[in-house]
Amino acid sequence: MIRIQAVNKKNELEKNITHERLKAEWEGYKWFWVDFDQPTEEETAELDKTFHFHPLAIEDCVVKLQRPKMDYYEDYSFFVTHSLNHINEDKQEINFFIGSNYIVSYHHELSKEMNDVWERLSLSKKINKWDPYLVMYHIIDKIVDNYFPIVYQLEDRLSLIEDNPNDETMEELLEKLFDIRHHLLQIRYTVIPMRDLIYRVINSHRLKGVKERYEYFADIHDHLLKLTEMIDGNRELTTDIRDSYLSINSHQTNRVMRVLTVITTIFMPLTFIAGIYGMNFENMPELTWKYGYFETLFLMFIIALGMFWWFKKKGWFR
């Protein structure tokens, strides 16, 4: 679907303009916005037929999930941005062509950000303040704002792992921890390129519309910096929690091994004594002693008790 809104020379917004009318009255508009919303192949062909955009830029629109970037052409600029679905974190590409008096947006899937800004422009009572760069600002601002709920949700999940209110096992907690870390990494792969893109945008000498609204685009960059810090901070927190759990697990294992070591050590001399008297020699004087059995048991008991006292004194049972 191709939908069009245009502002005429009287600063009046005209809605639901047909593609044919736009081509016929091109010069009669102050500026216009053409949105290629889930376009067909025939509609995509209009990027070349009507607007004569560069083949490489058109190819970037058709081929999904290019890296966020900005390219300059003779009389327009091309942008690739990425939005994230806050429910399933699916990545969606939204492209822009911006000229002196138009913005052309292109996206393969339904875009909530695009629809929100489209509706905002439709209902605006200050049309004279709008232009293609303000449209782009609002769309990118919406895209970036929608990153935050995803990161906040992961932060909440991380807090639950820290508190462990359901007394889950360490294996379950570590599995959830690695899942959160994976999601943070995926979001980072989106946020970092977008941050670099906006940095290029606000420092560009060719985008006059951005210079006029520098504070707005700089604010988006600040949000992306904040997101980067939040993501990196949470990734470090996942590492700290993982290390803490592994340290606790290692400590518990060491305590078990210490107890087993004490038991084994205590039984070593007892096993040695039992082994001696278990040998099948005929001439063993102790075997003929009247109280040899009880004396041997007493000796083994004293040895075990003495070793137990020694280990306890050394703090092995703490």
Description of each model-found segment:
Residues 52, 222-318:
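Hydrophobic alpha-helical transmembrane segments and their immediately adjacent juxtamembrane loops
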Residues 167-168, 211, 236, 271:
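Non-transmembrane, extramembrane segments of multi-pass ion/lipid transporters
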Residues 1-210, 216-219, 223-230, 316-318:
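Peripheral, non-transmembrane regulatory/ligand-interaction domains of membrane transport proteins
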